[in-house]
């Protein structure tokens, strides 16, 4: 069942006009992106506009390339690709073989913020490579083409200090016949790989995605610090995330309609899973599809407190062909190190009752606090 999120009344408010504040991401990321003193502010009406603005920011006044970029950027995106999204929705199985579309931010370390206006939409991805201090907010990504070409909605490679906040990412949790290796029709919502750490994923609405996100692309790509908070995952298959090593702090998320597996903690990683709401979920906390080097988890104050709650919330489990560990006893298997940032989680019940008013696009970047839970 699709989880319906209400829209803000001021549907066309330009969020970039709001006052800027120092970053408080509620997680490992500490970046303001490009929204700092001396930033150049630009408006983009298309994917190509964003590409052109970023390329220009790599050059000095004499047209010479500046390592890491010449100046920080704030890009307000007001394009609308609803027509492309609707066409893709009408031809789900035709998207996998199309060319991937995306903005590549490569070797840019001065800082970039990309923020969508309310009502904007994108049928293209944003791919980060060897950059840092990137913020992506209020962007609506739908039905990415080019699954055969790794056409992710957001890809973070060799890029530390990233904040992905208040976005919507959606496709169809569906398998089309004939895709390579039985792979999914669409690629990932948010993949985080290689030397990418100190990343915060917050207040996103992610639905209809089969492979939601990686933390590490192989068994040797481990050791990052990631926070996932106040996200809604609805009708998703797996990888929430698929964690290879490192530390993940997942708090105040709503997981509903998980069709295969949820938080999959592998390669000796550890996850702090705190004050989340789980319902209608298969294998919501597990270590599988690997066969060795299991991860561990610490469970704190989620709506599910013991196996006695599984039937109430429709939590189910299955086996894997390789050795695996499920949280079927709903007990912690590890102890998370101290969290190095300040955060104020609400109760799991408040997540269930109120998060839909805050997660996703067109919410004017509003956040859920304890005062909103009454």
UniProtKB/Swiss-Prot annotation:
InterPro entries: Pec_lyase, Pectin_lyas_fold, Pectin_lyase_fold/virulence, PEL. Belongs to the polysaccharide lyase 1 family. PLADES subfamily. The lineage of its organism: Bacteria, Pseudomonadati, Pseudomonadota, Gammaproteobacteria, Enterobacterales. It holds the Pfam family Pectate_lyase_4. Disulfide bonds join 93-176, 350-373. It catalyses: Eliminative cleavage of (1->4)-alpha-D-galacturonan to give oligosaccharides with 4-deoxy-alpha-D-galact-4-enuronosyl groups at their non-reducing ends. It is found in: Secreted. Its cofactor is Ca(2+). Ca(2+) binds at residues 150, 152, 187, 191. The gene is pel3. SUPFAM superfamilies: Pectin lyase-like (SSF51126). It comes from Pectobacterium carotovorum. This is Pectate lyase 3. Involved in maceration and soft-rotting of plant tissue. Residues 1-22 form the signal peptide.
